[in-house]
Design a protein with these regions (language model features):
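CBM-like, beta-strand-rich accessory domains located in the C-terminal region of large
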Residues: 55-261
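Catalytic Cys-His active-site segments of thiol-dependent hydrolases/isopeptidases
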Residues: 49-54
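Carbohydrate-active enzyme catalytic cores, enriched for enzymes
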Residues: 1-48, 98, 252-259
């Protein structure tokens, strides 16, 4: 429930472009992540724009702040704050359509944001020294509307994404993209949009990001909290290092109503 995926070639994985999307009423409890209205792109069965972070252990600090948390996914932060951990941080898909020529998905994550209030996750956070603070990405909710429209143009590999964003006061909206295999390239030479490209061995995913106003962009290969392998050793007792991933953020000026496309 709350999942969608479209592909260009169901018969040949090696030449197949795919994208997936999640906006689920089950929220982000158990093994689910705080990734409402997030998408991923793939080519040849390998990730392009993709959720980041490492699942070191269920409530490890890195796993909570950089894998489960919203900052790890291709979605939206509000004043740097993400979605709730628990069933309270939910989304849903109120409309969808699928045909040979065109597909459409509407995700609604208007109820996903705010402080962590789940008794279960508050207890787990306390036990694992995970602090649900504004410094770590959780605070009062200001989101009134976050609706993400995605149009899939048949088997062309082209999709159009349009975000409706409304808050109860002026806020900074941040558009997130991540890669795990190769660094992204970011081109800001055109004043109309920002061009971000993700690549893997066989393909590429090009994002052309338009917005209501001027964006401040940042790209980094550092996690918000480091990924330390303290749990899994090989047969020689060596704890292999977890690789860094790449993170792109485009942040708006303060605005109560905003649009990304």
């Amino acid at each position: 429930t709350g999942l969608a995926a479209f592909q260009t070639n169901w018969d040949r994985v090696g030449g197949n472009a795919m994208w997936s999307f999640r906006s689920s009423p089950y929220g982000s409890t158990s093994h689910a992540l705080a990734n409402q209205n997030a998408f991923n792109t793939f080519y040849g069965g390998k990730p392009l724009f993709y959720s980041s972070g490492h699942h070191i252990e269920f409530t490890d600090v890195h796993s909570m702040l950089c894998h489960r948390a919203t900052r790890a996914h291709n979605t939206i932060l509000v004043n740097g704050m993400g979605q709730r951990i628990g069933t309270e941080g939910y989304g849903w898909i109120p409309r969808y359509y699928a045909s040979e020529k065109i597909g459409y998905v509407l995700g609604d994550a208007s109820n996903a944001y705010g402080k962590v209030i789940s008794p279960l996750w508050l207890t787990r956070g306390e036990q694992s020294e995970v602090h649900y603070t504004p410094e770590n990405g959780w605070d009062e909710n200001h989101v009134k509307t976050f609706r993400r429209h995605i149009v899939n143009l048949g088997k062309t590999g082209l999709i159009f994404i349009y975000d409706e964003l409304v808050a109860d006061e002026p806020v900074n909206w941040s558009y997130l993209l991540h890669t795990t295999e190769n660094p992204m390239t970011v081109d800001k030479s055109n004043h109309l949009f920002v061009h971000i490209q993700a690549t893997n061995r066989g393909g590429a995913s090009d994002a052309y990001l338009f917005s209501t106003g001027t964006l401040q962009t940042d790209t980094t290969s550092r996690f918000f909290y480091p990924a330390v392998n303290w749990l899994r050793a090989d047969d020689k007792g060596v704890f292999k290092k977890y690789p860094n991933h790449w993170h792109f953020t485009a942040t708006s000026e303060k605005a109560q109503v905003y649009r990304f496309a």
